[in-house]
Amino acid sequence: MKVVEVKHPLIKHKIGLMREGDISTKRFRELATEVGSLLTYEATADFETEKVTIEGWNGPVEIDQIKGKKVTVVPILRAGLGMMDGVLEHVPSARISVVGVYRDEETLEPVPYFNKLASNIDERIALVVDPMLATGGSMIATLDLLKENGCKQFKVLVLVAAPEGIAALEKAHPDVELYTAAIDEKLNDKGYIIPGLGDAGDKIFGTK
């Protein structure tokens, strides 16, 4: 599995700001969007382009355009919604597929509860977004669902990943690509990433 920890100074700076314990909902939400945008820039760097001639201000001009990529952005509910706008800044024509998976706080197992996928998903590359890759269970369940519906190409974008989650994802889905702003130290006994960001969903939505 391809794992990319994006080490651009802007990303490192912004993810550092997100670690502040008493960060406001507004600021956390803004930073999640910004880091999601920067991760998308990195994740789409291998998209092929083709030459197209358009009518410019002074006659025909040849330009580069993305070549035939159909994209679906897949936020995992609910926290993934906090990264979605940042992704759409770069691929505004992408279709949105929504998958609902929550983690049982006692068993730490993923529990799927909702999905609404884009049409022709078998022809699309999926940019799957979720702020945290902790145990990997929610991401694995989402990728299982996408594959069951015919999707074949995946790029996973997360703000912070734990080594345990990376290992689990690689074992279950070695064909995906993972882009993360940070690989943290470990999971604690409750399955939270250390040092992590805290509960990203609560911080994005202002709930507890």
From Swiss-Prot:
<keyword id="KW-0342">GTP-binding</keyword>
<feature type="binding site">
    <location>
        <begin position="198"/>
        <end position="200"/>
    </location>
    <ligand>
        <name>uracil</name>
    </ligand>
</feature>
<keyword id="KW-0328">Glycosyltransferase</keyword>
<comment type="pathway">
    <text>Pyrimidine metabolism; UMP biosynthesis via salvage pathway; UMP from uracil: step 1/1.</text>
</comment>
<feature type="binding site">
    <location>
        <begin position="130"/>
        <end position="138"/>
    </location>
    <ligand>
        <name>5-phospho-alpha-D-ribose 1-diphosphate</name>
    </ligand>
</feature>
<dbReference type="InterPro" id="IPR050054">
    <property type="entry name" value="UPRTase/APRTase"/>
</dbReference>
<dbReference type="InterPro" id="IPR034332">
    <property type="entry name" value="Upp_B"/>
</dbReference>
<feature type="binding site">
    <location>
        <position position="103"/>
    </location>
    <ligand>
        <name>5-phospho-alpha-D-ribose 1-diphosphate</name>
    </ligand>
</feature>
<feature type="binding site">
    <location>
        <position position="199"/>
    </location>
    <ligand>
        <name>5-phospho-alpha-D-ribose 1-diphosphate</name>
    </ligand>
</feature>
<comment type="similarity">
    <text>Belongs to the UPRTase family.</text>
</comment>
<dbReference type="GO" id="GO:0044206">
    <property type="term" value="P:UMP salvage"/>
</dbReference>
<keyword id="KW-0808">Transferase</keyword>
<dbReference type="InterPro" id="IPR000836">
    <property type="entry name" value="PRibTrfase_dom"/>
</dbReference>
<dbReference type="GO" id="GO:0000287">
    <property type="term" value="F:magnesium ion binding"/>
</dbReference>
<feature type="binding site">
    <location>
        <position position="193"/>
    </location>
    <ligand>
        <name>uracil</name>
    </ligand>
</feature>
<feature type="binding site">
    <location>
        <position position="78"/>
    </location>
    <ligand>
        <name>5-phospho-alpha-D-ribose 1-diphosphate</name>
    </ligand>
</feature>
<keyword id="KW-0547">Nucleotide-binding</keyword>
<comment type="function">
    <text>Catalyzes the conversion of uracil and 5-phospho-alpha-D-ribose 1-diphosphate (PRPP) to UMP and diphosphate.</text>
</comment>
<dbReference type="GO" id="GO:0005525">
    <property type="term" value="F:GTP binding"/>
</dbReference>
<keyword id="KW-0021">Allosteric enzyme</keyword>
<dbReference type="Pfam" id="PF14681">
    <property type="entry name" value="UPRTase"/>
</dbReference>
<protein>
    <recommendedName>
        <fullName>Uracil phosphoribosyltransferase</fullName>
        <ecNumber>2.4.2.9</ecNumber>
    </recommendedName>
</protein>
<keyword id="KW-0460">Magnesium</keyword>
<dbReference type="InterPro" id="IPR005765">
    <property type="entry name" value="Ura_phspho_trans"/>
</dbReference>
<dbReference type="GO" id="GO:0006223">
    <property type="term" value="P:uracil salvage"/>
</dbReference>
<dbReference type="InterPro" id="IPR029057">
    <property type="entry name" value="PRTase-like"/>
</dbReference>
<dbReference type="GO" id="GO:0004845">
    <property type="term" value="F:uracil phosphoribosyltransferase activity"/>
</dbReference>
